[in-house]
Amino acid sequence: MNADQQILTQLAKEYREVAFAPVNEERRALWKALNGLRECRPLIMMDQLPWHELDVDGDLKLRCRDADARIVEDALRKQLYQAKYFPADKVFEPYLELPKTIEGYHHGAVRREVTLAADEKNDVVSHSYVSQLSSESDLENLKFPDIRVDEAKDKKRWEKVSEMVSGILPVRLTGVRMFHCGIWDDLVEAIGTDNFFFFFADEPELLHKAARRMADICQSLIDQLTEKQLFDAYEPTVHCTGAYTDELPQDKEKNVRPGDVWTFGLAQMLGSVSPQMFEEYEVEYVKPLLEQFGLVYYGCCEPLHNRIDYIRKIKNVRKISMSPWADIRAGAEHIHGDYVISRKPNPAYLAAASFDPELVRRELQETCRAAKENGCTCELILKDVSTVQYHPERLAQWHKIAVEVAGEW
């Protein structure tokens, strides 16, 4: 056993204890209740964290030398770190994930951009996209995907990783989970953020044609993933939230179709247009795409409290995002128990020069009051945390407060 294997074997043993703890089954049951719109306390998840700022006592320091071994080591160390400091309601799965090698999977244009980093260690950077769409002929820049799978390569990768962890944890080749259906988030990368809103006034017909092409590209992805049997029915999460449910065949291994899985839709760039334009430019195009799936998570950072009536036109929506920019009380009144409120508490509270725990508590309590008064189930999803100002203890403090507030339900 070489040095890398010794490191991974020890980490796998530690993770196995976490993953086989009874609390994971309890959490699965809670997520199934929440996602089934049954009475349940608010559930908590924490994701998209600034890992480069969080190393405590060397817990996250990589020690393996082999490139593949370091990928496995990184995944195990992060899971163990989260289990130690802020587990929330995360289910720690009893296996190692190894995503299948899928080539040609893209959503239209090849990104051309300039980036600017405030912290060279942070992978969250500013993006300025070079416009590739100014006339109808430029629609050809929005390319259709051609998906390919290298099964022989995946077999070798699986064998290598299985050997690395000495068989202590099973290794699971995973397919496509929580399919992304966000034509506008992809399209803005081709148009450029500087030009985007001018198109609604200056080039509405071109914008509609671009949306139509992006929807066709998305449909092509769905068709190819279905044909090549790449959808994965077992989805632990959807857009940073628990995806466990009794309503989909999550143990299905073959012939998995869109109707067997979750998807998530979003139109963050349309957060500044009117609700009526949201229907015209978003709902009309993505409704036929989203309705092919078993369940839908809708929304991300855009405020949706005044668009619930339009989202209702999409069948199978189960969760609706309420971002920090949403009016949570108005959103809860419109949702009225028909969907899970997926509340995104403000990550800026952890990024300020100083941390105010009472500000965090008030925000979470306001969410829970609004949900309960309107007969809604809700989840508290801390995500998009680009910095904690190198104070990792803030995440543990946020976690403690969230657990206390959820316990008051």
State where each predicted segment sits.
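Active-site loop segments of alpha/beta catalytic cores
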Residues: 1-49, 56-61, 65, 89-91, ...
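Extracytoplasmic/secretory soluble proteins
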Residues: 2-21, 102-133
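Membrane helical hairpin/interfacial module
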Residues: 62-112
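A gly/proline- and charged-residue-enriched helix-loop-helix capping module
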Residues: 119-159
